């Protein structure tokens, strides 16, 4: 199938799917074609994702989940991205999503948006509200985290895990 989330064609990224997410067309076309494909991509990535993280990605509705912190580090030539997230519901609280051996990190839009307009969580000021998370596995794991206000984060990595 190739990489659905970040298809490389001649060196250019094709991100029509995430841009479509923020339009009125999404509600009309997503149930028929895109959501089933996104679910298939997540199922194919399941073998590479720890069970607790897979449960979070598969069953959670992200509109009440917030990114509190984004940290990018490099150690021994490997890049690591950590996102601290918080969900309003008590079952998740604060957790850290860790992306190991990151070979690609891209942000579309400002990482921090002063004009962000969403209901704030009770504990602190977040970087953004997570609208959805898409994961796919081809040669590497590819993750697209869609934030409010047409912003998104892309990562291509060897491993994803959930830290508490």
Regions found by a protein language model. Name each.
Residues 1-164:
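Surface-exposed, interaction-prone regions used to assemble/regulate multi-protein complexes
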